[in-house]
Amino acid sequence: MSTLNHTTSQHEEHAYWGGIFAMTLCVFVLIASEFMPVSLLTPLAADLGVTEGLAGQGIAISGALAVLTSLFLSRLAGNMNRKHLLLGMTILMALSGLIIAFAQNYQTYMTGRALIGIAIGGFWSMSAATAIRLVPHHQVTRALAIFNGGNALATVVAAPLGSYLGATIGWRGAFLCLVPVAIAAFLWQYVSLPNMSGRKNGASGEGVFRLFRQPVVSVGLIACSLFFMGQFALFTYVRPFLETVTHVSASGLSLILLAIGIAGFVGTLLVTLVLNAAFYLTLIAIPLLMAAIAGALILTGHNVWIVALLSGLWGMLATAAPTGWWAWVARTLPEDAEAGGGLMVAVIQLAIALGSTAGGMVFNRLGWQSTFALSGIVLLCAAALTFMLSRLRESASWK
């Protein structure tokens, strides 16, 4: 079996597309596992004898462990074969499903959720670095878009599938159904991924935070964090907006949410072409367009057809954007993509938490219009910083 060292250029190697698609299946199971409790919260809480609020903390603990893992995994893993590390994360994912499915108490359930958090943080932090080593440089954005396609597909089907399985075979059966898919992802990665050596000199003693010394990295990560803050300041509260402002029915709500998911999946299929044609222009345009959508929703929130159309456009743009930011990591830090990926995971998770919290505070105190306005303002700031980032990259290329 072939072995790729840390700096292997895929211009001299053939592409491992089987490995890309195997990892995409793993992404699908990861995201489905992460958000499965959302649609199963009521029966899960009743069975474990806890409140729905406590059961919901299973999502919080997975997010917290994802942040910690993403920040320190590269340093802890040292020169470990990255194929073995990815396979280990996949085993943790399968083990998490088993532990949750057979959990007899709340503590065991939370242990299973902690394991899925470690798998999420580890897997995503290595995604850009792995894509760089599996495909030629000009195909990295496409590979990352395929990863994100697995994310988008899981986002579309996880909640309704979890709800259906929970109603037919119970919440334990729903989690158990993820285990054979995780095993299939493990086997596919085992046969399709090459051996990938880690850094022989290990990670810097300063860890991933040393990257903040580079202005382009600092500005880029702040711009990325503002984008996700602006996105989730609005999107977290789209359901109460649709129910109380647009006054959609239960079936209408499901259809609009499904349309958002489908549009997002389509966006991941198209974004590679746009990024390859105009990379930074695309990263600037996405938050600008989303800010415009936020403003348009304030003006037309009572018109169900316009809201449905704008929501679909929002889903297409918001779901496509992560592909661009992961590609930015691959372009900016090709020799340090693991550390950059770790920072990116932490930044995104924290930005989502901050955005949803700030949006909720404004929603409760000032109303939905102020929440949507806040989202638009933050997204405009993200676009401005991304423009600054493009100038920094341009000036650096002339030096």
Labelled PLM ranges:
Residues 68-104:
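Conserved MFS/SLC helix-loop-helix module at the cytosolic interface between two early adjacent transmembrane helices
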Residues 332-368, 375:
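A late C-terminal transmembrane helix in Major Facilitator Superfamily
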Residues 281-324:
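C-terminal transmembrane helical hairpin of 12-TM major facilitator-type secondary transporters
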Residues 69-81, 267-279, 363:
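Helix-to-loop junctions at the C-terminal end of transmembrane segments
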Residues 108, 137-138, 145-191:
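Helix-loop-helix hairpin linking two adjacent transmembrane segments in secondary transporters
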Residues 112-150:
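Cytoplasmic helix-loop-helix junction between adjacent transmembrane helices
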Residues 96, 107-115, 305-313:
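Paired small-residue
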Residues 49, 81, 102-108, 247, ...:
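Helix-breaking motifs and short loop linkers at transmembrane-helix boundaries and internal kinks
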